[in-house]
Amino acid sequence: MTTGDADVTVKNARIHVEGAIRSAVWCGGESHLKVEDSVIDSKDADPFDNDFRSLSVPMMKCVPFALGLDGNCRATNVLEAGQVTYENSIVVAEKWAPLSTDSGYPPTSLTVKNVLAGVGALEEAVPGKAYTATKTVAGKTWGYTMGGSGYVAYGDGGVTNLFEDCQFY
């Protein structure tokens, strides 16, 4: 998580989160976050669990029902004038929003280069097992299997998202 005017670089990291509104990467304020050679994924909370049902927060705890999607944990959430750059990485959300901006204003943005991003499941690749896609990051090969109901990338009006040499599923 970055906020204020922070300038942070994350390199060769493995970030995995589970639970409602527990974004793996959260960037707000006027901060800059660069993620390189890393593997990021998020897994939803069980929406029928009592802890989830009793959760009261001042923000969305799941994707709006009217969108016809399912999910309660984004892999990336960029807010305000935050800026996130991903390079040579994997970003997966189990059901909703691997790469998302929310309630931002210019220049809130994502810059995404040479990234595999998708909605579904991620694991260290098992030889001989079929995957939707595989990608090697920092010397380790990962297997991605498409699933879930959500979008890969989303940007609020007025923001800029740039994508180069990416695989979206």
Annotate the PLM regions.
Residues 1-2, 29, 40-77, 96-106, ...:
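Acidic/polar low-complexity surface segments
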Residues 1-8, 12-43:
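Extracellular beta-helix/beta-solenoid repeat scaffolds
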Residues 7-13, 32-39, 59, 83-88, ...:
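All-beta strand scaffolds that present successive hydrophobic residues in beta-strands
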Residues 15-18, 68-70, 91:
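Short linear interaction motifs
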Residues 17-23, 93-99, 108:
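Internal alpha-helical scaffold/solenoid segments in large eukaryotic proteins
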Residues 25-28, 32-37, 77-87, 92, ...:
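Polyanion-binding and phosphate-handling cores
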